[in-house]
Amino acid sequence: SELFEETSIRSAEVGRYQLWLLDEGHCFRDQLVKFCHLKNAPNQRFSYSRGSLETFMHFVEQGNGVTFVPELAAKTLSAEQSELIRPFALPRPARCITLVHHRDYVRHAVVDRLSEVICQAVPKEMLRLRPGQDLV
């Protein structure tokens, strides 16, 4: 695919390719459809699957379309798979994790600890928006 010759991909270009997306209702899919303006894209070729990102990566490795991989998941790919990754051109999408609990929830220490564990598990550079990123 000519996408492999690009160093970055503009969100407007994505609609020209066979896309492997998670099922409707999955937040990652919904955010990408919004960011890339795919909802009403003419001639869009979507493929939905109950499969996983790993399954979609195998399709892409075989030359059968394109998919999206979250940055955190991309950090775990093999060197060969990483060579297939192309970042979005600016602005790049970013996602936000929000912890929500009922105002009467009494175990604030549990929520605080969960927040700490999440922040420790995520690379430090991913804890804040970086220049050129846009929340989706």
Report each predicted region and the residues it spans.
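Conserved beta-strand edge residues that scaffold enzyme active sites
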Residues: 28, 50, 73-74
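Secondary-structure junction motif
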Residues: 3-4, 18-39, 107-116, 122-133
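Short aromatic/hydrophobic contact patches that present stacked aromatics
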Residues: 18-20, 47, 98-100
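Beta-alpha-beta core module
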Residues: 4-9, 13, 54-104
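Short beta-strand-to-loop elements that line the ligand-binding cleft
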Residues: 21-22, 42-52
